[in-house]
Amino acid sequence: DPGVIWLAKKHCPSVPLHLSTQAHSVNGAAVAFWREAGVERINLARELGFKQIRALAEAFPGVDFEVFVHGAMCLALSGHCLLSAWVNNRPANQGRCTQPCRFEYRGLSLLVEEQKRSGEALWEIREGEAFSGFWAPQDLCLLRYVGCLADLGVRALKLEGRTKSGGYVAQIADVYRTALDRHARREAGGPDCG
């Protein structure tokens, strides 16, 4: 919320501001806007690929970028899913997502067609007695690419942890820290970052 950023800068000008992934920063105009507003670290949207991250890092060399590298991928645009608010009255855009896309559902029979293609099923779900997480996207794991991100100028890596145990967070943080240290020592094992 630009208003919150403005108030924070007005009342606490010495506090560094970090922008959440929920701001969905996906392009140079957004980065320029938030930078001009006084944001020091911008967490880029999870949906960006290496080419987009590289372009932003090259266009804005003084910006401290953070990239989400490990955890759940959102069914919608990151942080903008309404399913959690609808199912559990816990809005994702307030950091309270219950990840209902990961719940197991049973679609007894569902055919979806688009108005202009009547009679042509675009999406079909048919299941028996079992339940499944058919809405859940595959988790994000960019461990192999942390060196590439570091070389692009990404200054911080974001790991999912809000809904995880302390032990899980410690283990994942250690794995990524080790990968970054190996990259800093230029040990072999990383992919071609193209």
Named regions from a protein language model:
Residues P2-S25, N43-L44, Q52-A156, T163-G194:
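Active-site pocket-lining/capping segments in soluble small-molecule metabolic enzymes
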Residues G38-V39:
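As written
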Residues G28-A29:
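Conserved nucleotide-cofactor-binding alpha/beta core module
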